[in-house]
Every structure is written in structure tokens, then in C-alpha cells.
């Protein structure tokens, strides 16, 4: 028994199709591209059918998330190859663990990382490898990078004598829970030329701290 939640309209007329979410009363086993039929409970009549695009479904919390989900499902409905499926998922989620991405696409971690490698080489996807691998979309990297550079500009203005913002403080600025992950992200930002990261501190790429000793010597 399940409820059907349409994602892009109020009703589906005969001959039409729509993206929908099946909300089951009890857990069920499903896999990508599995077909299904829908029947009314009483009387027992077949009313619709479809194909599963995303077994591990999630309910969008707002209009923006719903629009992003619909865009992702539209891409999946085209039956793209694995590489394009992964890129669409990463762009939809913004940030996702490699393990979750592999599970959602029913592939091994080795297969997933092999498929992601070309996107990483072209800087279309960021990969954090410290501990559990995490994948970030280019949009998410740009968003986090912009937030951090604005915070660093203010920090340097208030503390020109300091070598940079501590990683723990960067984590708070970026609203990240784990400092270890933040350090790996800062290292990625450094590779992309967004910041300099040394001695567990981040600074803008063109910032040089005020050298008090040199000033005193002169």
C-alpha cells in the first residue's frame, strides 16, 4: 500500500506522464530502472505504471529543492550513461559522500571513482579524499569559495597581523561540522588558487600578513 505524490502537477490525465514519489506504508526493495504498476485498493483496478528512477527517494523541503529534484529526474529519464548519471546526481545534491553516490547508482566505489575521475580532472567535480570520500559539485565549490573569500577579506581587514583564519573558524564560517573535512576542503581550494592554506590557517591568495618584526627593524 502506498500514496502517490505528484511532483509537477495536481493530477495526471489518461495518456499523460509525470514525475512522482511513491510513499509506501512499509519498506520495500527496489532497484534502478525497475518497472511497476499501480492499482487501486478497492476495486482492484490497474490505473498507472512507471519506472523507478531513484530508489532511495527523498522528499523536497521547498520549491527550490523540488525544482532541482525534477531537473535531476528529467535527466535520469533520458537513461544517460553512468558518468552522466553521476554528474547529474552530484549537481543535484551539491555535496554527497562517494558511498551514498555509489549506493544510489548501484555500483561499487571503484566503479564510481573511475567514472568521476574525468570530471575531477576538468574541475567539474571536487573530490575530498580524507577519510570517507566526498564529492562536491562545481556550483557548491564556487558557493563555499565565495563565502570563505568574503569572510577572509573581513578577517584580514580586522587582523592584518595574523597569518590567516584558523581552520576551526573556517569550518564555522562555512557551516561545516567537521574540522578535518574543512582542512581537506581548504587544501582543495588552495589547489584551485582560491586561498592559501598553511600552518592550519587560510588566507586570501594575494594576502601577505603584516610583518611586525620587519616593521620594528626598520
Q: Model regions: which residues?
A:
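C-terminal effector modules of nucleic-acid-centric enzymes and ribosome-associated factors
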Residues: 1-218
Amino acid at each position: 500500500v502506498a500514496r502517490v505524490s505528484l511532483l509537477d502537477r495536481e493530477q495526471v490525465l489518461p495518456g499523460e506522464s509525470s514525475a512522482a514519489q511513491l510513499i509506501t506504508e512499509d519498506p520495500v526493495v527496489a532497484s534502478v530502472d525497475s518497472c511497476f504498476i499501480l492499482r487501486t485498493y478497492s476495486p482492484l483496478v490497474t490505473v498507472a505504471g512507471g519506472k523507478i528512477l531513484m530508489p532511495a527517494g527523498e522528499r523536497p523541503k521547498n520549491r527550490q529543492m523540488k525544482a532541482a529534484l525534477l531537473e535531476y529526474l528529467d535527466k535520469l529519464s533520458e537513461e544517460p550513461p553512468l558518468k552522466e548519471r553521476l554528474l547529474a546526481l552530484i549537481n543535484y545534491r551539491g555535496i554527497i559522500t562517494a558511498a551514498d553516490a555509489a549506493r544510489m547508482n548501484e555500483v561499487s566505489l571503484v566503479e564510481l571513482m573511475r567514472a568521476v575521475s574525468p570530471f575531477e580532472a576538468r574541475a567539474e567535480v571536487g573530490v575530498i579524499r580524507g577519510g570517507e570520500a566526498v564529492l562536491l559539485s562545481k556550483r557548491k565549490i564556487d558557493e563555499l569559495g565565495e563565502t570563505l573569500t568574503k569572510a577572509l577579506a573581513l578577517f584580514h581587514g580586522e587582523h592584518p597581523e595574523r597569518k590567516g583564519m584558523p581552520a576551526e573558524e573556517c569550518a564555522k564560517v562555512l557551516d561545516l561540522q567537521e574540522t578535518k573535512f574543512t582542512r581537506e576542503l581548504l587544501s582543495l581550494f588552495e589547489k584551485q588558487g582560491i586561498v592559501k592554506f598553511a600552518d592550519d590557517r587560510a588566507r586570501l591568495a594575494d594576502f601577505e600578513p603584516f610583518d611586525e618584526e620587519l616593521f620594528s627593524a626598520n
